[in-house]
Amino acid sequence: MVICNMEDASRYEGLHPLFPTLFAYMRSHDLLHEPTGRITIDGDRLFINNSAPECLAADKQIIEVHRRYIDVHFLLEGSETIGWKPTGECTALSQPYDAEKECALYAEPAQTYVTLHPGQIAIV
């Protein structure tokens, strides 16, 4: 997991070949005022799920695991607490991996929590 401000995101562009394109898009677009939904940048290789999720308290969250995509959270307003736990330590499977939804769900507490504020990014 990487946590940073948008101003520092360029330090992490070398972690994935599509990060420079993603971060450039995020810097140059007002995502808060874009319609919610999928924003396609490079087909299925790179896209943004622009959403306004209901943020749950840490004790009500479940663990979401991805296999194909990297999840990059970019907070636009308010605050959001997200949890993390090593995938190999997740045991309470509540939804098996679904390739179409690209996730599996585990109903158990995370090991670590971080609260994001506007302009902050979490790469999980």
Predicted features along the sequence, with ranges:
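Residue-level signal for pocket-adjacent positions within structured domains
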Residues: M1, A58, A92, E100
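Short, mixed-charge amphipathic alpha-helical segments
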Residues: P109-Y113
